[in-house]
Each structure stands twice: as C-alpha cells, then as structure tokens.
C-alpha cells in the first residue's frame, strides 16, 4: 500500500494545506480516502514503525506544528502521541 498524507493543494484561488490521507492499493489499482489527520499538515515528516505511520511536525499556513500523530493502519485511526520540543517543518525522518 502507498499512502499520501497531508500536503498542500495549490489553486488559482489560493493555497490550502490539507489533513487528507489517501491510500493506493496497487493490486486493485484503487485509491481510497482514509481517516483525516487531526490538523492540516504541509511539509511534514513521515516515519513508519511496525504497523503505524507517524506524522511529525509540518505546518498549516503560518503555524508550525510540534505535534506527532500515529496512524494505526489496521484501525484507520490517528492518535496524537507526543509533542516535539520545538516546531519542525520540512524535515525528513528515518527509522533504523
């Protein structure tokens, strides 16, 4: 499965940061909307640990987030799990 999480929709009317999450199933060639993030996030970091996806920081307009959300792929549910010491935007994360 491939997940697209948050981001920015650029339109002639303006830029809108989004809380949307979509999942692509390559076997079915099908996109499906999933549970929304708790807040819109653009330029967020994403990491995968076990069966969970973490959305880390990012921004919404002029606001930079400190929150970290965990997505349970089996339950299709986001939970806020912690706060960063300071806001992070445009970062990349890796699990070793």
Residue map of PLM features:
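Kelch-like beta-propeller repeat domains
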Residues: 1-96
């Amino acid at each position: 499965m491939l997940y697209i999480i948050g981001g920015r929709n650029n339109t002639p009317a303006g830029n809108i940061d989004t809380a949307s999450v979509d999942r692509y199933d390559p076997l079915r060639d099908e996109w499906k909307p999933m549970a929304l993030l708790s807040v819109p996030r653009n330029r967020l970091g994403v990491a995968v640990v076990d069966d969970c996806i973490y959305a880390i920081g990012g921004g919404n307009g002029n606001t930079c987030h400190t929150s970290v959300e965990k997505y349970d792929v089996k339950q299709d549910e986001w939970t806020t799990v912690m706060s960063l010491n300071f806001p992070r935007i445009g970062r990349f994360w890796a699990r070793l």
